[in-house]
Amino acid sequence: MPVRQLPETIVNRIAAGEVVERPASVVKELVENAIDAGASRIDIFSDGGGRRKIVIADDGSGMTRADLALAVDRHATSKLDDEDLLQIRTLGFRGEALPSIGAVARLTITTRHAGEPHAWTLGVEGGDKSPIAPAALSQGTRVEVADLFFATPARLKFLKTDRTEAEAIRDVVRRLAMARPDIAFTLAGEERAPVTWAAALPGAPGQLIRLGDILGADFRANAIEVRSEREGVAVEGFAASPALTRANALGQYLFVNGRPVRDKLILGAVRAAYSDYLPRDRHPVVALFVTLESREVDANVHPAKTEVRFRNAGLVRALIVHALKEGLAREGRRTAANSAGSVISTFRPASMPAANWDWRASPSYPVGGSAIDAPSFAERPQAAFDVGGPSADIRTHEVAPDLLDRPLGAARTQIHETYIVSQTRDGLIVVDQHAAHERIVYERLKASLAANGVQRQILLIPDIVEMDEATVERLVARADELAQFGLVVESFGPGAVAVRETPSLLGKTDAASLLRDLAEHMAEWDEALPLERRLMHVAATMACHGSVRAGRVLKPEEMNALLREMEATPNSGQCNHGRPTYVELTLTDIEKLFGRR
């Protein structure tokens, strides 16, 4: 077959395959055009998952009659003044969106420029243009796309259900709305109630309002502002505290120069920053905005412009990690306050037993000769409560007054051998002793590793731990990494490991249990996992085994010592798994519980 030039309509349909992948791609391109046109309000409507109809209306600058005629030609754009593709400051710039959409759908554009006496309209159907005609429109541009992919029926077979495509459209609009809180957005159609996001004030407060409207009240309540800047690169936005996580990474919204992107470099930086706070199967919720010179980033990597390439990727990654870690460390106490708020919101007053309730039928009624049946109690019947009489003499251990002024207060008691209750000047704090000590041990291990290494204790008699051969090989292969944390192991035959030294920080530990947990975690590691991340996983596992367990009775001085250690430990508001280590209730919170406020 001889080589021949393809017709323009076929060329446009081929190009449309790169730009218009699904209805959500159409919405993205058209909304970006509206943003570039300076719109302050954008209305989006879709029907049938975008297959039947998509309508985008804005109040932007609009187009003149001459511009409208060129807008549907390939590679015609108003967004590039010269040949320098490295100085792109607009979201769309290729000049392919409108002709590509018109090549595979029925496209109608109605627009009015401020300098025109009236609006103009133009139709494109399967690549064939209709003449431009006068129309009625007060301001801006209205683009209607009907029967998407009617000209390429094979593409319809690859679309998902209407519901799935509608959700993809919703996700695109949400991301664009997050990037521009100064623009009002309305999303309607799909037999749903319209959703409107009003324009917010500029700056971080307005940005947080928009993010809260889209991501929910939980994100707004847990949001931590992050900011970092160096060498012309700025990172800002909001990150949720470790108390708010998800089972996947879909809650991570990333923007580069106002453009929503899905960048592996940024996602990896987010994971690294949260590695000390979350378990491996949980993901943070963040909205990060990276701003840098246009020359420092290539947005022309993919036709859909969802991928970017940084000139100095290392600097961008380091800034993101630094901004997130600094924000998380600064707001370490937020988790406790937020947890207390959730406790209050779900609290329901206890129901009192009926007046004729027989307490002897209660499971808590002592059986046999208990202290309550002793003569000393029987001979002295209980007196009625005397309002004017003195209070009961409840003796507790003495607490130094200055301890009440410490951030975590003075320990008062331990309940269920698991939780420490401490008193502060304006409330009380409940501490999970295991979670708190786990964070303390973890931070100590990290500090020791960064200094001169973790101190070891030699076992007089090595612990021999029996395991299957594959597990033994896995542990022995990582023996050098384990030794950095003071855990010295070696093979002891085909099915056993000898533990010769353990970290001093862990004290007396169950070596068999620790090794089995380490082996399970190592089995899940990707070979490409950086050494630093592997070491932090080892430290987290050791900290869990080396911390005080629930069920251990603590003396008052031990409880206070733990509180003081928490105050001196970074990130002590959460354990290594992202759970809160303590909950703080102010007097105001307590009064709300009892209906005093």
Swiss-Prot record:
GO terms for biological process: mismatch repair. The keyword DNA repair applies. Gene3D superfamilies: 3.30.230.10, Histidine kinase-like ATPase, C-terminal domain, MutL, C-terminal domain, dimerisation subdomain, MutL, C-terminal domain, regulatory subdomain. GO terms for molecular function: ATP binding; ATP hydrolysis activity; ATP-dependent DNA damage sensor activity; mismatched DNA binding. The keyword DNA damage applies. GO terms for cellular component: mismatch repair complex. It holds the Pfam family DNA_mis_repair. It comes from the Bacteria. Belongs to the DNA mismatch repair MutL/HexB family. This protein is involved in the repair of mismatches in DNA. It is required for dam-dependent methyl-directed DNA mismatch repair. May act as a 'molecular matchmaker', a protein that promotes the formation of a stable complex between two or more DNA-binding proteins in an ATP-dependent manner without itself being part of a final effector complex. This is DNA mismatch repair protein MutL. It comes from Rhodopseudomonas palustris (strain HaA2).
